[in-house]
């Protein structure tokens, strides 16, 4: 068990290294490299999709549309940048997904289709709202309130986290579906990207990544306690600018 946790921690450390490389590319004004690195990061672990709105808005405003095109040449240049950015983003996806797509085209049955198997493993909605190693977030308070209401109603107390893959069932309060979690996280992300849209910069990108990571930790689905690293580690890159 300890060896398994050690391997997992090293893997997560490697992923944060790729995240920091993408932020370094943004800091050194290399938007295409930034896009390619972040697209590769999404292929390595899809949990980073929570911070994708920050990258999308930054690359859109800092590279594709630094200003509104007002002439034919400016429009042509914007289209050229869009094509380059699209290629830098899509190539990592194609390199990793295309072999599976070709294999799935030869096998259309759901039981053995590799794309269907990937989907069920990447998005395990059956695992429930709270992880066994639950995060101290909004849903922890929600589950605590559910337990209090159950005690007040003198009902049998149900478990809100049954092992690593157990489902979460509330007793008094309504159950929370995955769509609600994603809608809340996306709504918060849309608020956080507004300053980045108005004035795209490296510092604002890092702050936006931090806030999006915090949103995923606070209201995400099946959040592990270590998911706080998605907010805490990027924050370290700009913390000295605000407190020193």
What are these regions (language model features)?
Residues 2-7:
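Short, small-residue-biased leader/transition segments that mark boundaries at the very start
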Residues 21-22, 32-52, 212-220:
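Membrane-interface alpha helices of multi-pass inner-membrane proteins
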């Amino acid at each position: 068990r300890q060896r398994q946790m050690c391997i997992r921690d090293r893997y997560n450390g490697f992923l944060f290294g790729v995240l920091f490389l993408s932020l370094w590319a943004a800091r050194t004004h290399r938007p295409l490299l930034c896009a390619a690195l972040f697209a590769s990061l999404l292929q390595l672990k899809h949990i980073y999709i929570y911070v994708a709105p920050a990258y999308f808005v930054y690359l859109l405003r800092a590279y594709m549309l630094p200003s509104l095109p007002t002439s034919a040449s400016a429009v042509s240049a914007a289209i050229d940048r869009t094509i380059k950015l699209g290629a830098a983003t899509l190539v990592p996806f194609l390199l990793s997904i295309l072999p599976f797509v070709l294999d799935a085209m030869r096998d259309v049955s759901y039981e053995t289709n590799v794309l269907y198997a990937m989907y069920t493993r990447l998005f395990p909605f059956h695992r429930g709202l709270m992880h066994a190693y639950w995060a101290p977030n909004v849903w922890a308070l929600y589950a605590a309130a559910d337990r209090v209401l159950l005690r007040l109603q003198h009902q049998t107390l149900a478990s809100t986290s049954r092992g690593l893959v157990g489902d979460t069932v509330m007793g008094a309060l309504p159950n929370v579906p995955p769509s609600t979690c994603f809608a809340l996280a996306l709504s918060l992300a849309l608020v956080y990207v507004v300053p980045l849209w108005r004035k795209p910069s490296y510092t604002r990108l890092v702050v936006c990544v931090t806030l999006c990571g915090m949103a995923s930790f606070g209201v995400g689905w099946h959040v592990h306690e270590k998911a706080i690293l998605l907010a805490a580690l990027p924050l370290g890159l700009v913390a000295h600018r605000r407190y020193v």
